[in-house]
């Protein structure tokens, strides 16, 4: 079951989707050009043990018309509004990609509202070598995602086919029905000129923060589990979060931080594929079963 909630936020209403039934609510935050329907496989894998509250971040999906500002401060304010609207005093938060950075920022700024966090293939930033230009790095890193926002399609089926052929999706265990639902939730416009509804301004604003986004994860004072994919955005062998980076971060607070690799996944299939979604669902269940501690008794690292 998918139910839409409209949550009042600055500038209008944020669309939040309640995915599945039964169990405790968990706030699930998607990636930079994604939408709430990226969580369909995870919601199904939870099998009634939790309900995902999946917002479309402002500038995406059914929240695409929400105005600026964009960026981490705006997203964390919207997340706080969702928790308040749903009566969640202290919740489990899970984020993928950009959503992992948003969850880390929220948990660092509002530890009293977070029971446990789950960060999926995001949350940390690799330091750039001195000889690498930051602007060129960002252009190369986000290039394929940004290029998609400029494409137009004659019909929804053409967009579905584009996604099926995507290197991260081709031959994967992503459900065809989930992929269609995810793509349809992104489409806007009229037949003959359909396109992604992601606001270009939002992506540009987020890109401007990318090199700083990894800092909040280092000051977390709540328990957190990080799951990483061994393959990248294009199913390439360069992961979003290298193992050595994740392990070093976890080593700074070994009692509070846990890191795991989800085998045979890439940046997309770690949440959208059947096998990745099962592992993510298990991490969410572990988070829900963790003891509730008073964050005021814990010290930031």
Task: Show where each model-derived region lies.
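N-terminal cap/lid segment of alpha/beta-hydrolase-fold proteins
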Residues: 1-13
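Conserved HGGG/HGGXW glycine-rich cap/lid loop of the alpha/beta-hydrolase fold
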Residues: 15-65
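Active-site loop/oxyanion-hole signature of alpha/beta-hydrolase fold enzymes
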Residues: 17, 53-94, 271
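Conserved hydrolase catalytic core segment
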Residues: 89-132
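A catalytic-pocket lid/entrance helix-loop region that shapes and gates access to the active site
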Residues: 120-154
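Conserved alpha/beta-hydrolase catalytic His-Asp/Glu region
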Residues: 150-207
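Conserved serine/cysteine hydrolase catalytic core
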Residues: 187-252, 261
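Catalytic histidine-centered segment of alpha/beta-hydrolase-like enzymes
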Residues: 262-275
């Amino acid at each position: 079951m998918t139910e839409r909630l409209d949550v009042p936020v600055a500038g209008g209403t944020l669309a939040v989707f309640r995915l599945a039934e039964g169990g405790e609510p968990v706030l699930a935050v998607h990636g930079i050009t994604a939408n709430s329907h990226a969580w369909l496989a995870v919601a199904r894998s939870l099998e009634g043990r939790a309900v995902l509250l999946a917002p479309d971040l402002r500038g995406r999906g059914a929240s695409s018309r929400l105005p600026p500002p964009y960026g981490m401060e705006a997203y964390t304010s919207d997340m706080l509004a969702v928790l308040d609207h749903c009566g969640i005093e202290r919740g489990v938060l899970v984020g993928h990609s950009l959503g992992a950075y948003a969850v880390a920022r929220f948990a660092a700024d509002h530890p009293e509202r977070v029971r446990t966090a789950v960060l999926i293939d995001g949350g940390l930033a690799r330091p750039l070598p001195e000889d690498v230009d930051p602007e060129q790095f960002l252009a190369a890193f986000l290039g394929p995602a940004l290029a998609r926002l400029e494409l137009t399609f004659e019909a929804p089926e053409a967009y579905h086919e584009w996604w099926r052929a995507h290197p991260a999706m081709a031959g994967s265990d992503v459900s065809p029905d989930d992929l269609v639902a995810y793509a349809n939730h992104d489409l806007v416009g009229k037949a003959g000129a359909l396109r992604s509804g992601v606001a270009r301004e939002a992506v540009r604003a987020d890109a401007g923060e990318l090199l700083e986004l990894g800092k909040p994860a280092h000051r977390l004072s709540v328990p957190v589990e990080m799951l990483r994919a061994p393959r990248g955005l294009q199913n390439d062998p360069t992961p979003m979060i290298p193992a050595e980076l994740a392990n070093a971060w976890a080593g700074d607070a070994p009692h509070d931080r846990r890191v795991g690799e989800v085998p045979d996944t890439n940046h997309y299939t770690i949440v959208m594929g059947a096998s990745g979604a099962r592992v993510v669902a298990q991490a969410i269940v572990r988070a829900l079963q963790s003891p509730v501690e008073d964050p005021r008794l814990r010290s930031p690292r």
